Amino acid sequence: MTRSIAAAYRAGELPAFFRLPAGDLAAAASEPRLDVDRAALADALRAYHRDLGTLDSGVEAQLTRLAHPASRVVVTGQQAGLLTGPAYSVHKGADAALLARQLDREDAPVIPVYWVASQDHDAAEVASTTLLDHAEELHRLTLDLPQGVPVGRVPWQPEWTAAVLKLLDRFDTAPEYRAAVRARVEQAIRGGGSFADVFARLIHGLLAPTGLLVLDPLHPALAHLMAPTLARELACPLEGPARIEAAARRLEAVGFPPQLRRPAGATNLFLEEEDGQRRLLRFDGRQFHTDTRLYTREELLAVLEAGPTRLTPAAGLRPVVQDALLPTLAFVVGPGEIAYGAQLREVYELHGLRQPLLWPRLSVTWLEPNVVRLLSRLQATAAEVQADPEGVLGRALARERGAAAASAERLAALDAELRALTAELAALDPTLEGAAERTRARTTARVAHLQTLALRALARQEDERARQLTRLKRHLLPNGVPQEREMNFLTFLLKHGEEPLRKLLSLPPGAQAEVPLS
């Protein structure tokens, strides 16, 4: 089984790969960030929010607090998904706000910031979204985004508006809830701009009451502040990748698969070329090149000077650019980002920075009333269903039908009996001990496998009768993916009004929760 870097980090392992242990908020808060020009940062964010159409008194108040010389930031971010994308995109923003609220002090304000990954150019990852209505019909909407172009450069299209509103209008739910979500979406679209701008307005609209600020790295005022970090990277373009590869080898040596690899010559930089395509920069020791042409360092520095939004960081540099710009106290991250972080400690040091605290993000599975009833009958949690849906249903049916042959207790009793027999045989003839033990292990494993097959057969029979497993999977494993990684958060607002948002913002930071809805 593949070892999880995120699980190891949560357990306090891998100290050589992370500067601060998980949860060490006191240490993170005690480290001042005197190198950040907070006034310039606040001015740039003000310009962005003004252009986005979200600059109001609440944002101004947060920008004033950000300009405080001792201010810190709890930052999170995500790709700019369609209609906010999977639910965890909203969950991450909420967690940043919850953690900032916990850490906030009058003499050291802490502001939550959401980094909108507008530079990302993988259209396939952001162009689709999934919703589930009251009739338990899964709605999958996919827009035709151009591939290879940063989503912050892709103008929102009128036909996309029509497709989104058509989906909302045929969603089976209470009219008042549909109208409220429709109003949110229309307001986000009305401001115009890019695909990423619509995402940013939706995220901000949901979480603005918490004081969350949104940040788009493609906004010229913000990109200008990031240019010095990118210029430093151009000065030694292969050193960062070399440090990432060295960390990858160290991870492999202790049994963990690295998340990031940098092939020979690959830098940590992308260039948006004249045709609008974002391409990886490579360096051969003398010149830079993409798949299309060669560049000198001087040419790239001129690009950075003339249009700093065209030179953007790859995954191995993006967090460093973020934390050079922001006075980061904590970075709210998912499991994949934690795995990246295990390889970036020395990349931060290359830029004269200290890697901030990585805060494992809040995780929520929403349980609608019919799901709560089914889970109660099955005597299972949502997580157990997501891990093994057929097994959960099969075990429940075996209990109901008194099918002891498929129970864990029966297997344990068999194993205990075989262990006793093995010991007795070994006492009669010690040379038989090894063979007897191997026979016991094989027999127990084989019976366990047969039990699994029997339970799955029971589950299939029940599913054919009542479709209960299919219904549970539709809620908890839509399209075979755990709920918060697939289902759009707007699903729950469409069916339950503002209740999910209220409950989300009442959770403790970093919660791992299964939350019932009424």
UniProtKB/Swiss-Prot annotation:
Coiled-coil regions, chain positions: 404-474
Keywords: Coiled coil, Ligase
Enzyme class: ligase
EC number(s) per entry: 6.-.-.-
Gene Ontology molecular-function annotations: ligase activity
Cited NCBIfam families: thiol_BshC (TIGR03998)
Family per similarity comment: Belongs to the BshC family.
Protein name: Putative cysteine ligase BshC
Source species taxonomy: Bacteria, Thermotogati, Deinococcota, Deinococci, Deinococcales
